[in-house]
A protein has these predicted regions:
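Conserved donor-binding/catalytic core segment of Leloir-type glycosyltransferases
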Residues: 10, 194-222, 233
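Acceptor-binding helix/loop patch of EC 2.4 sugar-transfer enzymes
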Residues: 45-59, 82, 112-144, 183-185
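Membrane-proximal helix-turn-helix segments that form the acceptor-binding/catalytic region
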Residues: 72-79, 102-106, 113, 133-153
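Carbohydrate-associated surface elements
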Residues: 159, 181
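Nucleotide-sugar-dependent
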Residues: 212, 265-270, 275-299, 306-315
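Nucleotide-activated donor-binding/catalytic signature segment of Leloir-type glycosyltransferases, i.e.
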Residues: 242-269
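Conserved acidic donor-binding segment of nucleotide-sugar-dependent glycosyltransferases
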Residues: 319-320, 324-331, 340-345
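A short, well-ordered alpha-helix in the C-terminal region of glycosyltransferases
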Residues: 333, 340, 347-361
Length: 381
């Protein structure tokens, strides 16, 4: 590769254009002087649509018509992309890989797939196998092929990488690790101007899904309902939102508020006013292998974080120094962790300070972008 020619990347597929992993990867590369041309066609309408398709909706003629039109648009746009050095398929992109492999092969260019998460595991964890076991097994076959065709796979944790190696026979030399990170242009330390200092505010935000175990937070709020100084806010939507709200209503909790999704600026301000960020507490395979965006965002904001313990958490962060870990699927353990942090201001300050230091040393927007650029340059040489 000429030292005078900037790397040119084609970011390709029916990926979720607004999903943080895709959006941040594109912006990180551009910040590191990589030219990124997006070749995207929308296929998915949202979370419920993806679940409906995975549960057997892919058999309906309407979906096939939608898919055919999406891939025709994608091919048309690809024909106008021009020269590129590496083709990257964004998340989720399992169905896109065979086409991407053909197109990149015709141009003799390397293919990279940012795997992010297993849609097969997602389908299993959301119970889709009960309604359509054939569809879920088909998803597994498609995903296995999608992981074997590219020249390089990008995965966020070593635990998830081992899962792909064990389940799909992927060679370790074909995998590179790239943490999720956060958009620290927005998620950064900031003051709260509307905080009631008499209230200890515990904030959860994210998708209400099984592997996050939002019900554990509700149960912890129930255990702490007699303490007027502790309040909970849960922000977001998702398949488990109604079930979680019903559980909270059954307890008549006055210390817990559900809030719909908001724009990111308002979300950041809400987080700035929280005394502690609550992570995930489920025990599904994905919950144990991943580190969610909200964890990195909390570190970037210098906020104390409570999360369920797991191999990936213990191998990356240090309990009592950069994060506070408790037993998963255990409301009493979460309630005790909240009380510990509420009563120990020095511990909260240490978690905030050391967590932020860890983020600055390992996970900044620019550092992750440099690492991704390095992977692509090594592949292009």
């Amino acid at each position: 590769m000429s030292v005078n020619k900037a790397l040119r990347v084609c970011y390709f597929g029916t990926y979720r254009a607004t999903y943080p992993r895709n959006r941040l990867n594109i912006e990180r590369l551009r910040m590191n002087e990589v030219e990124v041309v997006e070749c995207h066609a929308g296929l998915w309408k949202g979370l419920e649509d993806r679940e409906q398709v995975a549960g057997g909706g892919w058999l309906k003629p309407g979906f096939w018509l939608r898919a055919i039109l999406a891939y025709l648009r994608l091919i048309w746009r690809y024909l106008h992309v021009g020269r590129y050095d590496v083709l990257i398929v964004g998340y989720p992109g399992q169905p896109d890989i065979p086409l991407a492999r053909l197109l990149s092969w015709l141009r003799r260019k390397p293919l990279v797939y940012d795997v992010m998460m297993s849609i097969y595991l997602i389908a299993q964890e959301r119970g889709l196998e009960q309604s359509s076991s054939f569809s879920v097994q088909l998803i597994r076959s498609v995903e296995r092929l999608a992981c074997r065709l590219p020249d390089l796979l990008i995965i966020d944790t070593s635990e998830y990488a081992r899962w792909y190696q064990d389940n799909y026979g992927i060679r370790s030399e074909k995998i590179r690790l790239l943490p999720l990170g956060a958009d620290d242009r927005l998620f950064k330390p900031r003051d709260c101007h509307e905080k009631d200092d008499s209230i200890f505010l515990c904030l959860y935000y994210g998708t209400f899904i099984r592997n996050h175990a939002p019900g554990v937070i509700v149960e912890a709020a129930h255990l702490l309902a007699g303490d007027p100084t502790i309040r909970f806010e849960m922000i977001g939507q998702g398949p488990e939102r109604e079930k979680t709200a019903t559980l909270a209503n059954s307890y008549g909790l006055a210390n817990l508020t559900f809030i719909d999704w908001m724009d990111v600026d308002e979300l950041v301000q809400r987080a700035a006013c929280a005394d502690v960020i609550l992570g995930t507490f489920g025990i599904t395979p994905q919950a144990l292998m991943t580190m969610q965006h909200k964890i990195h965002e909390g570190l970037a904001m210098a906020k104390p974080i409570i999360n369920g313990e797991s191999p990936v958490m213990s191998s990356t962060l240090q309990h009592g120094e950069t994060i506070y870990l408790c037993e998963r699927q255990n409301p009493r353990a979460l309630a005790n962790a909240i009380l510990t942090l509420r009563d120990d201001q020095q511990l909260r300050a240490r978690l905030a300070r050391q967590g932020y230091k860890f983020y600055q040393e390992n996970l900044t927007f620019n550092k992750i972008g440099m690492k991704l650029k390095q992977y692509l340059e090594e592949l292009h040489r």
